[in-house]
Regions:
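Haloarchaeal acidic low-complexity proteome signature biased toward cell-envelope/secretome components but also
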Residues: 1-5, 27, 83-102
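Local sequence-structure signature of Cys/Sec-based thiol-disulfide redox active-site neighborhoods
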Residues: 1-29
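Thiol-based oxidoreductase modules, predominantly thioredoxin-like and allied folds used
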Residues: 7, 30-44
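Nucleotide phosphate-binding site architecture
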Residues: 13, 40, 66
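Chalcogenol-based redox active-site neighborhoods
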Residues: 24, 48-49, 75
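Structural micro-motif
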Residues: 49-58
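Non-catalytic, surface beta->alpha helical segment in thiol-disulfide oxidoreductase systems
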Residues: 58-94
Length: 102
């Protein structure tokens, strides 16, 4: 599974720009989970992911980080990261779980 997490904050002008660039991307990638985390209201999650600046966009494939963008990311670059993540093979934890279940 591919996941994209955008870390923002309400007073961040660049975050508003990133949201505009991301408009419609969820429709283009219906199998990807998109989340937005406001670091002012969910500091614990930001700390868990090691995020200190906004906007920060993280891309995960099968629970493993495959891309990180600090600052505004162009739509083409984000789409390339999403497509690359979608081609990642399952991570070690997933493979081990599959083996254990046998």
């Amino acid at each position: 599974m591919t996941e994209v997490i955008l870390f923002t904050q309400e007073t961040c002008g660049a975050c508003a720009t990133q949201r505009e660039k991301n408009e419609g991307i969820e429709d283009a990638y219906p199998d990807v989970e998109f989340r937005e985390v406001d670091i002012q209201t969910d500091l614990e999650t930001a700390e868990e992911y090691g995020v200190r600046k906004t906007p920060t966009t993280l891309v995960y494939a099968n629970g493993e980080q495959t891309a990180e963008f600090i600052g505004i990311v162009d739509r083409d670059d984000l789409e390339a990261a999403i497509e690359s993540a979608g081609q990642q093979s399952p991570g070690l934890a997933h493979r081990l779980t599959s083996i254990i279940r046998r």
